[in-house]
Amino acid sequence: MSTATTTVTTSDQASHPTKIYCSGLQCGRETSSQMKCPVCLKQGIVSIFCDTSCYENNYKAHKALHNAKDGLEGAYDPFPKFKYSGKVKASYPLTPRRYVPEDIPKPDWAANGLPVSEQRNDRLNNIPIYKKDQIKKIRKACMLGREVLDIAAAHVRPGITTDELDEIVHNETIKRGAYPSPLNYYNFPKSLCTSVNEVICHGVPDKTVLKEGDIVNLDVSLYYQGYHADLNETYYVGENISKEALNTTETSRECLKLAIKMCKPGTTFQELGDHIEKHATENKCSVVRTYCGHGVGEFFHCSPNIPHYAKNRTPGVMKPGMVFTIEPMINEGTWKDMTWPDDWTSTTQDGKLSAQFEHTLLVTEHGVEILTARNKKSPGGPRQRIK
């Protein structure tokens, strides 16, 4: 999936043995191979591949690295022929996969990229109902997720790179004895999703530098003692924010808030989308249809699927003990999306802005509990629109 090298930071070298990961964009697995790209070697770059077949299958994307003027320190676009919809572009090379201590419990995809238990559960197509002892553990994971997101959000400012934010999230996650759920999930290369401006979701942290006036979504997920937490918020970068960015972001924030108010036993998952889209439309925005909320807890993603758009046909009724996310992606322009050649980054087709907010929620006997709720010290928060 990602382009990774064997380079590690000095601190990592001092405390951990170097782990080698395949540099293939569609691979990224740990390997003991010593097969190196000869072109990279001439430029002082060490890029290792699993075998000849992996090298040949990934070479078309990998060769973009050879065009970097300053080796690993020089930022470059790995997809120079790709027609981006807006100004945000991939900025490579990606930093190497970050180390997770051996003693931290890991989900099954940490080893090979495949969430086998999740795939097996998907075939059952049932919505988990969690017991009190399980809910206690999910609540703890969500509390840690909120801590990590707030720490990363406090560093959002002009001049910081999305990769630096990823490093913060990674370090704060493992400091708490948790595993960053996105890392190696279907070979996703990072511990955080960072979505800037027209990026809807699943942005890969790289050398992109945040600028005054940007908006950036930080999507944090972690795995702690067998359970996942999932939350995200969109933050303003600096103070000089356009009225379009303010309206799109605040509309998304409000859409999540009104959807949460509907959550209680007996509410259908289908009706959430009707109210979300109504509010978005009233504010001259649209709702992304490709991605949806989902069950979370024992699994990173599971039933129910929760679309955020109107007139959807998703089945299911809320019952006490259900845990899921609501995460409306609201666009300034068209609802239609497109995906970059990295097979992850989703952006608006028209290059206009997108904003998202997400909470993990527990249905109680009489309503809902926001497991990932903000606290008084949480960075960010609403701002007044500009008329």
UniProtKB/Swiss-Prot annotation:
In contract to the MetAP 2 isoform, is not inhibited by the fungal metabolite fumagillin, an antiangiogenic drug. CDD domains: MetAP1. Zn(2+) 4 binds at residues 230, 294, 327, 358. Coiled coil: none annotated. Keywords: Acetylation, Aminopeptidase, Cytoplasm, Hydrolase, Metal-binding, Protease, Zinc, Zinc-finger. InterPro entries: Creatinase/aminopeptidase-like, Pept_M24, Pept_M24_MAP, Pept_M24A_MAP1, Zfn-C6H2. One of its GO terms (cellular component) is cytosol. Its cofactor is Zn(2+); Co(2+); Mn(2+); Fe(2+). A zinc finger (C6H2-type) spans 19-73. Its EC number is 3.4.11.18. Binds 2 divalent metal cations per subunit. Has a high-affinity and a low affinity metal-binding site. The true nature of the physiological cofactor is under debate. The enzyme is active with zinc, cobalt, manganese or divalent iron ions. Has high activity with zinc; zinc cofactor is transferred into the active site region by the ZNG1 zinc chaperone. HAMAP family: MetAP_1 (MF_01974). Cotranslationally removes the N-terminal methionine from nascent proteins. The N-terminal methionine is often cleaved when the second residue in the primary sequence is small and uncharged (Met-Ala-, Cys, Gly, Pro, Ser, Thr, or Val). Plays the major role in N-terminal methionine removal. Less efficient when the second residue is Val. Belongs to the peptidase M24A family. Methionine aminopeptidase type 1 subfamily. This is Methionine aminopeptidase 1. It comes from Saccharomyces cerevisiae (strain ATCC 204508 / S288c) (Baker's yeast).
